Regions:
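Fold-independent oxyanion-binding glycine-rich loops
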Residues: 13, 42-45, 83
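Cysteine-nucleophile active-site neighborhood
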Residues: 1-32
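Short, acidic Gly/Pro/Ser/Thr-rich loop/turn segments
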Residues: 18, 46-49, 86-90
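Hydrophobic, well-ordered secondary-structure segments
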Residues: 5-8, 25, 39, 70, ...
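Catalytic beta-strand/loop cores that center a nucleophilic Ser/Cys/Thr
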Residues: 27-76
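Conserved beta-strand scaffold positions in the cores of enzyme catalytic domains, especially
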Residues: 10, 39, 78-80
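Acyltransferase
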Residues: 77-133
Length: 133
C-alpha cells in the first residue's frame, strides 16, 4: 500500500523494489499508545528517502529498510505501514485508540466494549514471542 502512495507523490517518500524479501513478525512502539504494536511483514520494497513522520519505532524486526529503526508513515489523519493485517485485530489497544479518536471527531462518546479474547491473544503473543521469560 505504501508503494502506491510513493508513486502518486501524495506523501514525501520513495519506495524502491529490492532483490530480497523482508518476511517475519514485527514488534514496534508508537507514541499513539503505551503498548507494543505487533504485526507481520512480507515485502520486497524498502523506503529509501522520507521526510514524513514515522508511525512506529522498531523494537524487534525491520523498519523502512534493514538497519532502519523507523516504520510507517503518519501525516494528519493518514496512517500507513508495511504491516499486514489483521493489524487492528491483533492490536486491541491500537484499535481502541483509533475507535476513541474517530468517535471523538464525531462528538460521540466512547463506551468500552468487552473484548477479552483479543486482549488475551495479544498478551499471549507478547509472552510467547517477545517477553520470553
Amino acid at each position: 500500500a505504501l508503494d502506491l502512495f510513493s508513486d502518486l507523490k501524495i506523501l514525501n517518500f520513495k519506495s524502491v523494489k529490492e532483490d530480497f524479501r523482508i518476511i517475519g513478525e514485527q514488534v514496534y512502539t508508537t507514541d499513539l499508545i503505551k503498548n507494543y504494536v505487533i504485526g507481520f511483514q512480507n515485502r520486497d520494497t524498502v523506503i529509501k528517502e522520507y521526510s514524513e513522520t514515522p508511525l512506529f519505532k522498531v523494537t524487534t524486526g525491520t523498519g523502512f529498510a534493514p538497519n532502519n529503526k523507523n516504520e510507517g508513515i503518519r501525516k494528519n489523519n493518514f496512517y500507513g505501514t508495511y504491516l499486514l493485517g489483521p493489524l487492528l485485530i491483533r492490536n486491541p489497544y491500537l484499535l481502541e485508540y483509533f475507535t476513541k479518536n474517530l468517535l471523538k471527531s464525531k462528538n460521540v462518546k466512547y463506551k468500552a466494549m468487552l473484548h477479552d479474547t483479543a486482549y488475551q491473544a495479544y498478551d499471549a503473543y507478547l509472552k510467547n514471542f517477545v517477553n520470553k521469560d
